[in-house]
Amino acid sequence: SYEFLKPYVNHIAFISEGNHETEIKRRRDVDILSWLIRLLNDSGGNVIKGRYSGWNEFVFYYKKGMDKRSILTHYHHGYGGNAKRSKGMLDSQIATFQYPDADIIFRGHDHQKFHDPSNVRYRYNKAHKTVKTCASHYIKTGSYKDGLGSGTSGWEVQKGFMPTKLGGWFIDFEYRKISDVGGLDITIREAV
């Protein structure tokens, strides 16, 4: 994992626990994620370790701290199996209603990869007594693991899983003085 992630060390803000990491920690009392993050940080990174689920706030300053905007994200490693028809798309709306303050929602676990920006919600500003609509980005983080290969053997083949799109995501934030997203434009693009 270290050799794979090392070229991207300056682009990784945080890495969270997954079911494999928590099982190794539970059964062997070894925190392999802390080891990985220490290696990345020793290579010039500033990676923070996250738990299985949680929140991150990214704060952006404009003109030497005179003005700032933030993006709130909710992450959860994920759960469940390989939904053959929906590929987990139904969870997108449920998560948006469950975490209405999150600008971006990250989910993983089942190795599906997609981005759904279609969930729009109303946000009420008590201080200004105004209502606005905001998009919530739902990101299934994907994986670089091809568990099916040629489809002849392996755990995923035995369980009848469908092929998944490989790769991850890059998220670019651009601070603009005028924008519909609170001064920040979000661009989400595939990392393959």
Question: Predicted segments — roles?
Answer:
Residues S1-V192:
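Extended recognition/assembly regions associated with phosphoester-bond processing machinery
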